Amino acid sequence: MVRFPLTERLFVVRHDRGASRRADRFRLPPALGTRIRSIGVRQTRGMASDGLTSRLPRPWDPDAFLVAFDDWARSRGLTLYPAQEEAVLELVLDRHLVLSTPTGTGKSLVAVAAHAAALAQGRRSYYTAPLKALVSEKFFDLVETFGPENVGMVTGDSSVNPDAPIVCCTAEILANIALRRGPDADVDSVVMDEFHFYADPERGWAWQVPLLVLSRARFVLMSATLGDVSAIASDLERRTGREVARVTGVERPVPLHYRYAVTPAQELVEQLLAEGLAPVYIVHFSQAAAVERAQALASVRVASREQRDAIAAAVGGFRFSAGFGQTLGRLVRSGIGVHHAGMLPRYRRLVEQLAQQGLLRVVCGTDTLGVGINVPIRTVLLTGLTKFDGTRMRQLTAREFHQVAGRAGRAGFDTQGEVVALAPEHEIENARAAAKAGDDPKARRKVVKKKAPDGFVSWGPASFERLIAAEPEPLASSLRMTAAMLIQLLSRPGADAPASAPGSAFRVVRDLVRDNHEPAARRAALARRAIALYRTLRTAGVVEQSGGGFDGTARVRLTVELQADFALNQPLSPFALAALELLDRDSPDYALDAMSIIEATLDDPRPILSQQEFRARGEAVAAMKADGIEYEERMELLEEITWPKPLAELLEHAYETFASSQPWIRDFELSPKSVVRDLYERAMGFADYVAFYQLGRSEGLVLRYLSDAYRAARQTIPDEAKTDELRDLIEWLGELVRQVDSSLLDEWAALTDGAGSASDPHRADAAVLPPAAPDVTRNRRAFLVLVRNELWRRVQLAALQRDDELVALDPDAGWPEALDAYYDAHDAIGTGASARSAARILITEHPERWQVRQIIEDPEGDHDWGIDAEVDLAASRDEGTAVVRVAGLNRL
């Protein structure tokens, strides 16, 4: 029994080890004692810094902190749930906390309390999440709560105020800090959000390592779907000597009602809307299915005239680009949203903001709903209970189901949330056929049941009921050992001590591989893996060992000095720096080759590469047919055709050479590809490129890749390696991304410039309209590349004699006649690097227009022909791209 004095009265808490700690007499001060009536989205949004930091008691006083925190919460219109009260109390008592409560029970407010308690005690706290977008969102939230001077962020792409007392980061960032600094790392308190990622086979190690290493820190482990974590909690208590409190099994503030529907999806949506169960989030397990469903629902009267008018007023000035943007524009004006990871960020935020304002009655999306998006939902409609996990189709796990289903029901608005599972399509058709036959035996005998497709993984009411009743599966450990992790451990202060010393490299590595959450067989495998990696590092000369035997005198030291952000940034950046030295700066292809090196270090954008390969194979088949190659040989040759891989042979040899002295790099795969280069060489804009490869459903992924390439090029390529052409290329890429959707680069720029006081772009009350794209003409270097690309595209088409495409671009330029005249004088049009050089373009600048001439490179070197055009600067500013009006192909 522990007695804890509070300012106004006493309450008593009984501690039952391994169980949720409930108060025998949980009599808090009046300021902490009332039950919440309405919490809503406000608990995780808009916590403005109107006094929390200034209210924190200094010196630390637990009683005063509880009252101050409650006063601040009330000033924000919030009242704590009993579960929140209990969780905050455990934090004040300086215990670890496992917080496994349903969605809508205010876990984010408990996280704020954890950071506030640490700040009040002069301690340093970390917030971790699985996605950079969630880290960024939480950063802006905490900046509003604690002020920009108290909050920092580190994501690997960028960092702002990294020495702040509160740091937001991805789980991998904290894991690497733990590996490199050990128990003495400057980490006093850790809030791990979405802790169920602990079981992720690829990334789960990053959630486990801090628990194993940071023995001084207090941990808050949060998720709505943790399952049984008693083993993890017991191990944490053993390692740290600090008790673990568990707040779990809390009743949802908005209960859920479940039903299984054997009704066509469109008809079911109409029923749900008629029953007043909007907004409805329809869960699909592919992006294509989500878009197709939304388009199918466009024929349904989802929104009333008044609702459509309100939507039109909200989105009136929003710029929807060609392609998917125009499709989305039509859908949202009908009250239907689409939400998935392949969309442009500004489109996703538009849908989220319209939904938060209650303007969208239906949102068709993917199961990303379960991780971090803030869309208020009354009803979750699951179109299936199976998904493809990258290897096979399988039924949803209990955790996956509850992650999504738990989002139904809006606290403060709904008395209950609805979760509806749709039967398989063939079963729905069979049910309709049976219903149509009625009770007529003859008609029923004629009904031919439709079979499930071959290989179909089915589900039914029993599957649904099992998922409803099932607790989330126990979290399975997924620790691993890599060369990069081993180097981090070997670089820890004191690691070069004799093997018998507690902090020596031998002891540190042994402790990690022998004392973790893995079963015995896996621990033995980790130990063997660590030994093999160590031998590789010694052979490469990265590690030196002095002494040996079993007398405990052996010492280990690294022979290389690691950069400060080793393994925190793009892991192949050091290789890229070395590979740049292999290029000839005088080569006309130097700029594109340098970009190809950067691209080879980035993650593969699989949808883009698949479409590149598909198109390349289609063109190859057409060419082989024209050459009369037989079918069998064509099929054999096709196997060798893939997406473009510039410098592949050079980079593969360089990679092997680099890995011989830096073996840790083998943990990261080199992947030559050409997306930025392909885009530039084709002289296309973003919309043209998306349309060319039919990537409308993945344009967000295309933009994310281009933005990653831009950041990597800016950060990795040193200034002394940047020629004028390479600077032009990088500036063009940045401007292209910015004009399509500036949110990615603006947010990154704000962070890297230290603008920590930037407002939260994710807030529900943020403007629906995105910030206007910057003036495309203001960056002369980038704008000039846009102009040159427009002209170069005409050169390419003219070289291929594609009159129809040129006429489509410039109907009044007289292309057919001009090309006839040109080819009477010359046999070909050059398209090599020299033909595209800056020397081949002449510009006469006027205040509102440029006169430009693209000189054609002919075989004789006469350079007497050129494309004359005018650049309209005002129109370019309006459209966010170079508006080039071609007058024609003319001879001097």
Task: Give a label for each model feature.
Residues E857-L892:
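Compact beta-sheet-dominated globular domain cores
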